[in-house]
Amino acid sequence: TFEAKLPAGRYVGVAALGNVTREIPFEVKDGSVARPKVNFDAAELTVVPKRSPDSDVETQAKTEITKGDFKDSVYGQNTAFVPAGEVLLTGSIGPARAQETLAIKAGEKISHELVIPSGVVVAKAVYAQDGKAVETDDIRFEALSAKETLDGTRQTINGVYGTGKIMEMPAGDFVMRTRLGKVMVEQPFTVTAGKRSEINIDLNAGVLAITAPGAERIDIVETTKDLQGTQKEISGRYGTRHQETLHPGDYSVKVSYDEKSGRDPKEIKATVKAAERTETNVPE
């Protein structure tokens, strides 16, 4: 209830029940008490979000409740007052989404289970099968849609840097794209609703570390030349040291020096092996 002393006249009161609001016109007359009444035409809705029908309540889930101009949202299992009629529920857990339409009757007290088919995936990587695990946070995991678009690309669903981190995912089939240095690997995987999935990516890669005292720039290029006689650049940087993650194979290392030094550029060969660190020194 609400009480106030008002001058005689016509007014509009605004009443709220949660996010449900109603406007009530009323008139105050001299010497009398106005008693406007409001009918919210609403119900009490408790949303119970789950990843699968047999899983526990998901406390991290967000549910948006909409009907026309009405909007409200709750987290985890929670209650909101909603207007009667058809109400749209949109639940989300990370990138996973689910929608349902409920028919609400005024005065009801409803508890509704909203299933948002989703799970989590934990990605790890090794440099080679049965080889050393990747520990650097420079590695990037991207979960992509299994189907390609018309232009041949895949939609990014989620992504993280570093290994062993949890990614929220909708249930379904996907492709994990993994990048470290100049290495990129794609591997299919499946997420089951209400479950935790683990994927271990074989990068088939090694590390090439180059030291070149006095160098101005170090470049790693392909050993073969194209029809124009040029070698494709793979990686490079200014300075006397350079390190890169590469697929196994033979590479050329080009070292250039400041013009003032009067030194000629150098080129040497280097071989990278899976799960190994190759250290190459370019003498002065």
Regions found by a protein language model. Give the residues of each.
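Intrinsically disordered, low-complexity segments enriched in Gly and acidic/Ser/Thr residues
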Residues: 204, 211-250, 255
